[in-house]
Amino acid sequence: MVKGTNAEQALAREEASSSRPKRQRVPSIVEEEGENGGGDVVVRSGTLFELDLLDCPICCNALTIPIFQCDKGHIACSSCCTNVSNKCPYCSLAIGNYRSRIMERVVEAFIVRCPIVAGEASSSRQKRLRVPSIDEENGENGGRDVVVPSGTLSQLDLLDCPVCSKALKISIFQQSLFLAKRQNGCTETFSYGNELVHEKKCSFALCYCPAPNCNYAGVYKDLYSHYAANHKKLWTRFSCGYSMHVCMDFESKSLVLQQYSDGPLVVLQCFKEPPQGLFWTVNCIAPSAPGVGKFSYELSYSTAGNTLTFRSSEMNRIQKVSFQTPEKDFMFIPEYILCPMGLYKGTYICIRSLEEEEEEEEDNED
């Protein structure tokens, strides 16, 4: 049987060692039932007596992942980011784009007990603790029972500086770091926690091959070369500014167009959803980096005297093809006007380069 309470054992260990890591007795299931068991492991933990610090400062509910922060460090839960229209109520900066990774790790590492104390219900996440007085610490009976919201941080090293490994003290600053370099890769720096935001706009972000059963992924230029070299039978060439007939039936579901050898890849997809009709999407496989894969397009479908036209001033850029029915940026063809023979007739697309159009406008202004 374990002698003394856990608190008494912890106090004895603290007196025996001045180093920050504490060696605690971790009981096994057998030991808790009365038999000797368990082993000695080094566990660093601490108690937080203000557990409401882990509540969302806007809605006051317990923080859950994902947790977001603005550029000034104010945090909010995902629901509140939506409710405040992604505008921080404290500083009016944008919030909802950048994850607060350290807060997410801290919240995950906290352990709280059931709020039921001695058979009586207490308020949420509150428990009764013995707070010793000075006399009690000197050996005399004292102290008092108070109800405080508290929890145990099971990974105390989360509160250490990741550089020097010493305990963090105010002021604490965000760390700037390099994106993991690939060969001849990106050297841009950004705040810690903003990796995903940067990667979407980074020209070195990975793009995935649209060919069926192909697992290739690489930077967009390498992907274009890979597709031209390995999947020639699967693509059709397009030229900017020229309307072309789209030869694809309902069962194909996707068609890949390539501007020229090693050129940009454009994916046309159709999603048939009976009895509604057909959803058409057009996307360029490219990162959202400036000057990469910027196109506009016009898609049209004609049958039995009916013509539908969809124009987009800027084609969506994606890194990986999705096979989910789109919720926006699509052309919808009702079931009743679909050609029973499929889409071999009457479907045309015209793709234009936005960069070329911008250059022409500049030349005309000159």
From Swiss-Prot:
Binding site for Zn(2+) 2: C209, C214, H226, H231
CDD domains linked to this entry: RING-HC_SIAHs (cd16571)
InterPro entries (alphabetical): Sina-like_RING, SINL_plant, Znf_RING/FYVE/PHD, Znf_SIAH
Known pathway: Protein modification; protein ubiquitination
Gene3D superfamilies membership: Zinc/RING finger domain, C3HC4 (zinc finger)
Domain of life: Eukaryota
Annotated transmembrane regions: none
Matching Pfam families: Sina_RING (PF21362), Sina_ZnF (PF21361)
Broad EC category: transferase
Zinc finger (RING-type) stretch: 56-92
Keywords of this entry: Metal-binding, Transferase, Ubl conjugation pathway, Zinc, Zinc-finger
EC number(s) recorded for this UniProt protein: 2.3.2.27
GO biological process assignments: protein ubiquitination
Stored SUPFAM superfamilies: TRAF domain-like (SSF49599)
Positions of region (Disordered): 1-37
UniProt zinc finger (SIAH-type) residues: 109-232
Positions with a binding annotation for Zn(2+) 1: C114, C186, H198, C202
Reaction(s) catalysed by this chain's protein: S-ubiquitinyl-[E2 ubiquitin-conjugating enzyme]-L-cysteine + [acceptor protein]-L-lysine = [E2 ubiquitin-conjugating enzyme]-L-cysteine + N(6)-ubiquitinyl-[acceptor protein]-L-lysine
GO molecular function: transferase activity; zinc ion binding
Disulphides: none
Function: E3 ubiquitin-protein ligase that mediates ubiquitination and subsequent proteasomal degradation of target proteins. E3 ubiquitin ligases accept ubiquitin from an E2 ubiquitin-conjugating enzyme in the form of a thioester and then directly transfers the ubiquitin to targeted substrates. It probably triggers the ubiquitin-mediated degradation of different substrates.
Comment field on protein domains: The RING-type zinc finger domain is essential for ubiquitin ligase activity.
Similarity remark: Belongs to the SINA (Seven in absentia) family.
Protein name as it appears in the record: E3 ubiquitin-protein ligase SINA-like 1
Organism: Arabidopsis thaliana (Mouse-ear cress)
